[in-house]
């Protein structure tokens, strides 16, 4: 009996523990990589890859999210995508033959709806990132882990929605193109002649779009180079100004030294003249007295020499 009660108690406790354990969040599978072929698909692929990079929420991403850099980049990519979609639709309507107006109106309406959904979802991504930036600025240095978690979850869901929108738009474009081709009563040779330029235009547009993708990086590098060149010119100008200032100071010092040297030379000449005026009379007086003394000695010697000579004779 005790064993039975023990088994029942264990089962009861196990069931309670199972009830209070939190339900794990289901693992979200990464959507497959977007397959691109047409120019609008390539443009959407760049938007997709950029959004994948933003979703990593790396240090660089978080730093650029605090500014308007990310939203500006997304705006450019979004505008390029919608522009390419409109251009591709216009090319289909221009290059391929007519169809029934009723069918064309229906397909065009469905295509516009799919295009609008894609644009709205891309706009939602940009709005959500702008909202995240505003919320981070409001936190004033507090922890933003919860905000980043919500943003990551939202971006993951938005990427799924964008993938569904893109696939739906891709299918409707294919249907639209097929409907146009079915309505056009042309031979295989005529289709080949018409589609050849269209495919060439698509290839050229794809190359142009790929070049435009590199253009922002080139513009950034050129802007950085211009800023560096401007800074170097500014430093060089400051150095030249400082050198000119030092040169002027040296010239001023040299002029002052020359002026002082001239004054000292003039003072020395004046002092020399003054000394000469002082000692010249004294020198002349000494010379005169010396000459008189010599004359007296010579006279005395001559007088004493004369009697001695006479005595010898």
Swiss-Prot record:
Residues in Sequence repeats: 76-97, 98-119, 120-141, 142-163, 164-185, 186-207, 208-229, 230-251
Binding-site residues, heparin: 158-161, 225-232
Ranges for region 8 X 22 AA approximate tandem repeats: 76-251
Domain of life, per lineage: Eukaryota
Post-translational modification: APOE exists as multiple glycosylated and sialylated glycoforms within cells and in plasma. The extent of glycosylation and sialylation are tissue and context specific. Glycated in plasma VLDL.
Region: Lipid-binding and lipoprotein association, residue numbers: 206-286
Region span, Homooligomerization: 262-313
GO process terms (BP): acylglycerol homeostasis; cholesterol efflux; cholesterol metabolic process; chylomicron remnant clearance; high-density lipoprotein particle assembly; intermediate-density lipoprotein particle clearance; lipoprotein biosynthetic process; melanosome organization
Subcellular location, record wording: Secreted; Secreted, Extracellular space; Secreted, Extracellular space, Extracellular matrix; Extracellular vesicle
This protein's GO CC annotations: chylomicron; extracellular exosome; extracellular matrix; extracellular space; high-density lipoprotein particle; intermediate-density lipoprotein particle; low-density lipoprotein particle; multivesicular body, internal vesicle
GO MF, one example: identical protein binding
Residue numbers of Phosphoserine PTMs: 143
Residue ranges, annotated region (LDL and other lipoprotein receptors binding): 154-164
Residues modified as Methionine sulfoxide: 139
This protein's record includes keyword Transport: yes
Ranges for region Specificity for association with VLDL: 274-286
Key words of the record: Chylomicron, Endosome, Extracellular matrix, Glycoprotein, HDL, Heparin-binding, Lipid transport, Lipid-binding, Oxidation, Phosphoprotein, Repeat, Secreted, Signal, Transport, VLDL
InterPro entries, per database record: ApoA_E, Apolipoprotein_A1/A4/E
Signal peptide segment: 1-18
Primary role: APOE is an apolipoprotein, a protein associating with lipid particles, that mainly functions in lipoprotein-mediated lipid transport between organs via the plasma and interstitial fluids. APOE is a core component of plasma lipoproteins and is involved in their production, conversion and clearance. Apolipoproteins are amphipathic molecules that interact both with lipids of the lipoprotein particle core and the aqueous environment of the plasma.
Family named by the database record: Belongs to the apolipoprotein A1/A4/E family.
UniProt subunit comment: Homotetramer. May interact with ABCA1; functionally associated with ABCA1 in the biogenesis of HDLs. May interact with APP/A4 amyloid-beta peptide; the interaction is extremely stable in vitro but its physiological significance is unclear. May interact with MAPT. May interact with MAP2. In the cerebrospinal fluid, interacts with secreted SORL1. Interacts with PMEL; this allows the loading of PMEL luminal fragment on ILVs to induce fibril nucleation.
Name assigned to this protein: Apolipoprotein E
Species this protein is from: Tupaia glis (Common tree shrew)
Gene name linked to the record: APOE
